[in-house]
Amino acid sequence: MRIGSLGKRFGILLALFVLSSRGHGQVLIALLFGEKLNSGKLEFGLTGGLNLANISNIPDAKSRAGLNLGLFFNIKLNDNLYIHPEAIPKYPTGVSKVKPYSLNNPGLDSLLSSGDVTRKIKNITVPILVRYRLKGQLFAEAGPQIGLRTKAKDFFESGDLTYENDIEDHITRFDFGFALGLAQRLRKEPGAMALGIRYYFGVTDIDKFDEGSQKNNVWQINLSIPVGAGKQKQKAPAN
């Protein structure tokens, strides 16, 4: 399969995946296209797991946990080297337990001053990784990652009171950085699931106004599930 043809298919699938806002719609797309896309040198499937996100230079902030969901291609160059692009429409970042800041409303400021703030940022991300076999079915991976911010809100909580503040004007539309990690295939056979751990460190200052450089940092634990690869193996003619 040529890289140009693969790029077109990846772009079409990414657009469909993003437009399907609910998780079950994304799973359905993967099931519909998986069998047609998988081959001896190409795996396609779903990836999902846990994000543990933080933002640098926000005093006393704690990490924020959230679930990610996307699709992946695993393109075999040789037995040890792979190109591994992903499209992840559900990629949460942000922080929790931030000290309240002024909303320029004395009444609200007084009510919310004893609580804390959770910053929730929704993104679409596309990492383009190189995977190299270290030993057996254990792979190292590294590469660039670009993110598109879709929503950004701060949630103030003080006792039973909750207040939502839209901060999209404060957060950059795009984020760029690098990801590195390890991936362990659970079996040698085609179509095997893989369990991975990854760290993303952003190089973009995502806050347009606050002093200091605020950059995304995310730990990920993911499970990758090829779709249709097992059927392709069954259909392959015997040598």
Residue ranges of model-derived segments:
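Flexible, solvent-exposed loop segments that connect beta-strands
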Residues: 57-60, 92-122, 150-174, 206-212, ...
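Residues on the lipid-exposed face of transmembrane beta-strands in outer-membrane beta-barrel proteins
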Residues: 46-50, 67-77, 87-89, 126-134, ...
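Short glycine/proline- and aromatic-enriched beta-strand/turn motifs that initiate or cap beta-hairpins
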Residues: 24-76
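Outer-membrane beta-barrel "beta-signal"
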Residues: 184-188, 215-239
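Outer-membrane beta-barrel biogenesis signature
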Residues: 4, 21-43, 79, 86, ...
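Residues that define the transmembrane beta-barrel architecture of outer-membrane proteins
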Residues: 40-42, 63-67, 120-124, 172-178, ...
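Glycine- and aromatic-enriched membrane insertion/assembly motifs of diderm outer-membrane
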Residues: 43, 60-110, 124, 137
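Repeated loop/turn-to-beta-strand initiation elements of outer-membrane beta-barrel proteins
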Residues: 80-83, 138-140, 188-193, 229-233
